[in-house]
Amino acid sequence: MEWLPPGWCPKVVAFDIDGTLTDENKLLDMHAVEALRRLETAGITVVLATGNVRAITYGLWRFIGLKGPICCENGGVLWHPSWPEPIVRASGQEAKQAAQWLAEEHQEIDPNGITTNAWRESEWCL
C-alpha cells in the first residue's frame, strides 16, 4: 500500500513543544531545533502548536528562528508577529465568572487562590 504519492511534500507541519521538542525535563532537543530549521529552509512552513501561552511560544519561536504562525493555548490563540492582533478563539469569561461566583457563594474559598496564568488569552482555569 502506498501512503503518499511519489514526490509528495507537505506545505505545513505542526509540532507540539512539551514532550515532542523537549524531553521529560522540559529540556529543548537541539537536534529537533535543527530539523525544524531544515524544514523551513526546504520551504515547508513550521507551526508550533502547544498548550503554552503566547509569550512562551513566541520566545521559543524566536529562538528557533521560525517563520510560520504559532498555535497556542491548546488552539485557543493563533498568531504571527506580522499580524495586527492574535486570533482568539475562546474568551474564558464564563469560567472566570463562574470562579468569581464560586468564591462569593462559598466563603471557605479564598478568591485570591482562584487564579490563572496572567498571560492566558483564551482560557481561564480553576
Regions found by a protein language model. Give the residues of each.
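Non-catalytic pre-domain segments flanking phosphatase-related domains
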Residues: 1-15
